[in-house]
Amino acid sequence: PAFYLDFKAYRAGDPNYKSTTRDVKRLLTELEKEKVDGVVIDLRNNGGGSLQEATELTGLFIDQGPTVLVRNSDGRVDVLADENTGIYYKGPLAVLVNRLSASASEIFAGAMQDYHRALILGGQTFGKGTVQTIQPLNHGELKLTLAKFYRVSGQSTQHQGVIPDIQYPDVMDTKEIGESALPEAL
């Protein structure tokens, strides 16, 4: 899934706003009724999305606790956490990743790995461990890096990504993909 959240409806207080976590929760309910043996979440080629959704989705699979740490440019560290007690889905879980899994995908996969909650399979992820915002300009936009995020383990994914528990080769050449391939990346 992409880590989407209908920000406009959410901020307006619409109780039916759309989000990744709500959709995954509904699908998990259906799968549990079918008595599946386990669930595979495919984050290959997933560029990320909402940091809030990455945290909330993680919360479906862990029993409360930090999901990601965000260090702002002033040095302040904010801890984003699942504050809901209980695990929504307790069954076996695998997460598929590749070099094009980035940002919120890495936050989710990293948290699942740090909590020993899922088996991470595939290739090393993109290595985007930063948080950006887009500022509109008169003739375009400017993307600003505001913060760096860290996994629950304290590791940064910047330039190194998430290393899967079980790696397998990718069908494409990934040497030139990712933050580490950019000469001036932070």
Regions picked out by a protein language model, each given a short descriptive name:
Residues 157-186:
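Conserved functional hotspot residues or short segments at active or partner-binding sites
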Residues 143-144:
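Short, small/polar residue-rich loop motifs at catalytic or cofactor-binding pockets
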Residues 1-138, 148:
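Cleft-lining beta-strand/loop regions that shape enzyme active-site pockets
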